[in-house]
Design a protein with these regions (language model features):
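Post-transcriptional modification and biogenesis factors for structured RNAs
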Residues: 1-186
């Protein structure tokens, strides 16, 4: 488990983040990692979450949790700077987040998915990325307030989950920074 219990609690406790309660530089956005099987991918996502200032990470199902040498190798210490919490049942975590007022934005390729750049991202929210092969669990898709996808133009129909996470995380950061005054901009 995380060596900093106060940061774990910060990721899971209390109302959805707001500009008034977030530490400086943090976004009113979380991410839920649903059954990510590679600890290296999880470590990379911790590092990216730190870089963009996500409010915290929720690790669900079989997703690797710190401390683990393979996770820490790619996280480069970000497990100590990004608040996180582990939920054995990612769908239960999503229900709790929605009950606390967070919109659930799922990154997945479905017929109903909206192009990620055209989507109107709500704040505060939690975005969800899923298993490297099977994607986001159906139980999470049914809870989604919005499903977005990154269009693919090559022969391969998907990106590595940590790459997709990074693209979406920076997109979330840009959208937050472009909000008009009074709606959360800088």
């Amino acid at each position: 488990m995380n060596d900093l219990p106060d940061t774990r609690a910060a990721a899971a406790a209390g109302p959805p983040p707001s500009r008034a309660t977030l530490p400086a530089g943090r976004l009113p956005a979380y991410a839920l990692l649903d059954n990510i099987r590679s600890a290296w991918n999880v470590g990379s996502m911790f590092r990216t979450a730190d870089a963009v200032g996500l409010a915290g990470l929720y690790l669900g199902g079989v997703t690797a949790t710190p401390p683990r040498a393979d996770l820490e190798k790619t996280a480069l210490g970000a497990t100590q700077t990004v608040p996180w919490d582990y939920w054995p049942d990612a769908a239960a975590c999503a229900r709790r987040l929605r009950a606390d007022g967070l919109a659930l934005v799922v990154l997945e390729q479905t017929p109903a998915a909206v192009d990620w750049e055209a989507a109107d991202l709500p704040f505060p929210h939690c975005f969800v990325v899923g298993h490297e092969v099977h994607g986001v669990a159906p139980e999470l898709l049914t809870q989604a307030d919005l499903v977005v996808e990154i269009p693919m133009f090559g022969a391969k129909r998907s990106l590595n989950v940590a790459v997709s996470f990074g693209l979406l995380a920076y997109h979330v950061r840009r959208r937050w920074m472009r909000q008009p005054p009074g709606k959360g901009a800088r």
